Amino acid sequence: MIQMQTNLDVADNSGARRVMCIKVLGGSKRRYATVGDVIVVSIKEAIPRGKVKKGDVMKAVVVRVRKDIRRPDGSVIRFDRNAAVLINNQSEPVGTRIFGPVPRELRAKNHMKIISLAPEVL
């Protein structure tokens, strides 16, 4: 469950290391985001010579959350850290690689490019 002021790791090679959620997109009263949701983030920590720099405001897709994700078959999946992948205005990933596993719930939200770049889909 991601809300405003939540810090997330960045799971791609865009150059950002840590971001902070500043808005959950999808309705004026929407409070929480989960896997597959698009949020607006501010870059809080970045590496030198990356594609993004500290202070940039971008969109991101949440790919891992610590909160339990319940599946229709009754199973539950949860991750150790909250993580997101930066995207541009055309909903394409800014980076060219994705690090770590991503859940298959991203497929239902039409983030196929992220699924195809990920090394493991749970």
Swiss-Prot record:
Disulfide bridge map: none
Does the record carry Cell membrane as a key word? no
| Any one of the GO CC terms | cytosolic large ribosomal subunit
Which superkingdom, per the lineage? Bacteria
CDD domains found in the cross-reference section: Ribosomal_uL14
The UniProt keyword set, sorted, is: Ribonucleoprotein, Ribosomal protein, RNA-binding, rRNA-binding
Q: Which GO terms describe its molecular function?
A: large ribosomal subunit rRNA binding; structural constituent of ribosome
Q: Which InterPro entries match?
A: Ribosomal_uL14 (IPR000218), Ribosomal_uL14_bac-type (IPR005745), Ribosomal_uL14_CS (IPR019972), Ribosomal_uL14_sf (IPR036853)
Q: Does the keyword Protein transport apply?
A: no
Swiss-Prot/TrEMBL GO biological process terms: translation
| HAMAP family in alphabetical order | Ribosomal_uL14
Q: How does it assemble?
A: Part of the 50S ribosomal subunit. Forms a cluster with proteins L3 and L19. In the 70S ribosome, L14 and L19 interact and together make contacts with the 16S rRNA in bridges B5 and B8.
In UniProt terms, what function does this protein have?
A: Binds to 23S rRNA. Forms part of two intersubunit bridges in the 70S ribosome.
Protein family: Belongs to the universal ribosomal protein uL14 family.
Q: What is this protein called?
A: Large ribosomal subunit protein uL14
- Per the UniProt record, the source organism is Rhodopseudomonas palustris (strain HaA2)
